[in-house]
């Protein structure tokens, strides 16, 4: 009879186990891979940083430009245009003035022109001053912003110092008014009450 009872219990347990569905979760790293496929942006900051770097690598670099610096302030724009005109018409030009000198930037459709301008005018004397001519690679705006944000974040982390150091527990302060209340609320002993009652009756 005990054997039959055990068989009944075993069968009922097997039936309940077969009807019960067990949910098995996949590994977290595999589940996270479904986010981009479903159109959800990755929540991990490292993933966003990798995506941004990947996009920047895919973007083609900007065309190189020529920079002419240390130009005397009394040199006119027309003089600079005449100097560049012999190499063709630039597709981009900009002139910057500061307190000491001028700087102009040019971009040409033919990159080989840049080398010729450097050979022709680097160290060229203009109004008793030697100008400097160089070829440089301009950066995209978001690249400069990322570099600025990284420097800013580093400065903030250095300013914070040790993590958690700015969370300081302030000591509990009790005002003088509360101290007075605490003294008044102190329970009086039975002997003191009897003494006060005797003094009141005698008086």
From Swiss-Prot:
Record keywords, A-Z: Acetylation, DNA-binding, mRNA transport, Nucleus, RNA-binding, Transport
GO biological process, one term: mRNA transport
Domain RRM residue range list: 64-138
Top-rank taxon: Eukaryota
Localization annotation: Nucleus
GO cellular component: nucleus
Basic residues bias (residue ranges): 139-153, 163-180
Stored Pfam families: FoP_duplication, RRM_1
Disordered: annotated segments: 1-60, 137-203
UniProt-recorded name of the protein: RNA annealing protein YRA2
Organism the protein comes from: Saccharomyces cerevisiae (strain Lalvin EC1118 / Prise de mousse)
Annotated gene: YRA2
